[in-house]
Amino acid sequence: MSLADELLADLEEAAEEEEGGSYGEEEEEPAIEDVQEETQLDLSGDSVKTIAKLWDSKMFAEIMMKIEEYISKQAKASEVMGPVEAAPEYRVIVDANNLTVEIENELNIIHKFIRDKYSKRFPELESLVPNALDYIRTVKELGNSLDKCKNNENLQQILTNATIMVVSVTASTTQGQQLSEEELERLEEACDMALELNASKHRIYEYVESRMSFIAPNLSIIIGASTAAKIMGVAGGLTNLSKMPACNIMLLGAQRKTLSGFSSTSVLPHTGYIYHSDIVQSLPPDLRRKAARLVAAKCTLAARVDSFHESTEGKVGYELKDEIERKFDKWQEPPPVKQVKPLPAPLDGQRKKRGGRRYRKMKERLGLTEIRKQANRMSFGEIEEDAYQEDLGFSLGHLGKSGSGRVRQTQVNEATKARISKTLQRTLQKQSVVYGGKSTIRDRSSGTASSVAFTPLQGLEIVNPQAAEKKVAEANQKYFSSMAEFLKVKGEKSGLMST
């Protein structure tokens, strides 16, 4: 049998299973429809009692009667002997705590009934007053006349002034219809039932709170009477609660929610009654999980103390709660102020010397010479001699451009060259005439020349170096002197004047 045949056989078997499953579903469909029809609420009934049946139930009446009976007795702690679960009042406390959940569901049903009936008269009131109990009280106060919104003292005790103003303005423009007397009576009956159920719920809370301090005083001090009763009911009694570890107590009351495709950001997994208690919810959200673990650990200790009927006055509970609050305060303390530290002392390492005779000598020795500076310098807009790469090597730049072609010729700057006076120029001229010319390179006069001479005839003879100059000057005074005048010569024949 090939691989393709095996795959085809598997597909045929899967198809047969689907057909068989579909037949089974078709047979069970009527039963499912019957269940759904029973769970749906028919809010179109004439009276609220057709949908809200808790108020007239036997279980509700028995629990409330037992609560009133035990409140009047005022049992003492010395009467409880043995396990707490053996006390007859313990079962009443657990049943009363469960009854509060049913009352909440009943209030939601009655609120929906009143909302559907009163939308005929004032359809906008549902969006203006979202709270269920406030809506029920407002409907009972207004009734069929919406003019009661103005200057109504009873309504001011239910709603805020801003909400009353919005309700009165909306009531003046609403397009609702007047209710008949029968419809108004049914609404009043539903409102009265809802308010009485709410009062019964508060009565149960007061009773559970007073009795939890009697059955489990230390546990109720830490997490409150209502939360203590809830976790005791889920655990199956105080004895079972005392045997549970803290990690399991923290999860009591956790519900697995199926969101069917919705966002899971608001889901809090592994959270139970302790997480939603007042002592944990008073903290910021980022500390609540940590606080729930701490409170669960202390609740375990308190439950074990209560199960042995020790510390009936709640001394251990107060100590544990003080320890919890101290840790909560420690967690919420701001971080310590960071100390301002001074900068560390700098490391005095060997510094670079930027002055001194030795440094200047080194700079002169290793620095660029004037010739190199001239060779590196180029003129803007002028073509270089080796622009076409005819010669090998680097360009000479400005070096020797304005000279005679010698590489080392000094460049003369007319603005900065040395100047001498005219008197010094005449003196140098005279010396060049006497000594046959004198320059910076060549000088005919000896360095030992003097006006004193030694001769074999006269011995010591003083010679005037300027005597020869005077002879030349006297010879030149006749024709070339600046003091010479024009001479008037009279010719013998022509009679003309000549000079």
UniProtKB/Swiss-Prot annotation:
What does the UniProt keyword field contain?
Acetylation, Coiled coil, Disease variant, Isopeptide bond, mRNA processing, mRNA splicing, Nucleus, Phosphoprotein, Retinitis pigmentosa, Ribonucleoprotein, RNA-binding, Spliceosome, Ubl conjugation
Q: Where in the cell is it found?
A: Nucleus; Nucleus speckle; Nucleus, Cajal body
Modified sites of kind Phosphoserine: 379, 395, 432, 439, 450
Q: Where is the composition biased (Acidic residues)?
A: 7-37
Task: Please tell me, according to the UniProt entry, what happens when changing residue 194 to E.
Answer: In RP11; mislocation of the protein in the cytoplasm and reduced interaction with PRPF6; the result may be a deficiency in splicing function in the retina
Q: Which GO terms describe its cellular component?
A: Cajal body; MLL1 complex; nuclear speck; nucleoplasm; nucleus; precatalytic spliceosome; spliceosomal tri-snRNP complex; U2-type precatalytic spliceosome
Predominant subcellular localization, coarse grouping: nucleus
- PROSITE patterns reported in the protein's UniProt record: NOP (PS51358)
Gene Ontology MF terms in the entry: identical protein binding; protein-macromolecule adaptor activity; ribonucleoprotein complex binding; RNA binding; snRNP binding; U4 snRNA binding; U4atac snRNA binding
Q: Where is this region: Disordered?
A: 1-37, 334-357
Residues annotated as domain Nop:
215-333
- Any signal peptide, and if so, which residues? none
Phosphothreonine modifications at: 440, 455
Q: Mind telling me which residues the site (Interaction with U4atac snRNA) is annotated on? A: 289
Q: What is the residue range of the motif Nuclear localization signal (NLS)? A: 351-364
Query: What happens on changing residue 270 to A/K?
Result: Reduces binding to the complex formed by U4 snRNA and SNU13
Q: Which family does it belong to?
A: Belongs to the PRP31 family.
This protein's assembly is summarised as: Identified in the spliceosome B complex. Component of the U4/U6-U5 tri-snRNP complex composed of the U4, U6 and U5 snRNAs and at least PRPF3, PRPF4, PRPF6, PRPF8, PRPF31, SNRNP200, TXNL4A, SNRNP40, DDX23, CD2BP2, PPIH, SNU13, EFTUD2, SART1 and USP39. Interacts with a complex formed by SNU13 and U4 snRNA, but not with SNU13 or U4 snRNA alone. The complex formed by SNU13 and PRPF31 also binds U4atac snRNA, a characteristic component of specific, less abundant spliceosomal complexes. Interacts with PRPF6/U5 snRNP-associated 102 kDa protein.
What the protein does comes down to: Involved in pre-mRNA splicing as component of the spliceosome. Required for the assembly of the U4/U5/U6 tri-snRNP complex, one of the building blocks of the spliceosome.
Which disease does the UniProt record connect it to? Answer: Retinitis pigmentosa 11: A retinal dystrophy belonging to the group of pigmentary retinopathies. Retinitis pigmentosa is characterized by retinal pigment deposits visible on fundus examination and primary loss of rod photoreceptor cells followed by secondary loss of cone photoreceptors. Patients typically have night vision blindness and loss of midperipheral visual field. As their condition progresses, they lose their far peripheral visual field and eventually central vision as well.
Q: What is this protein called?
A: U4/U6 small nuclear ribonucleoprotein Prp31
- Gene transcribed to yield this protein: PRPF31
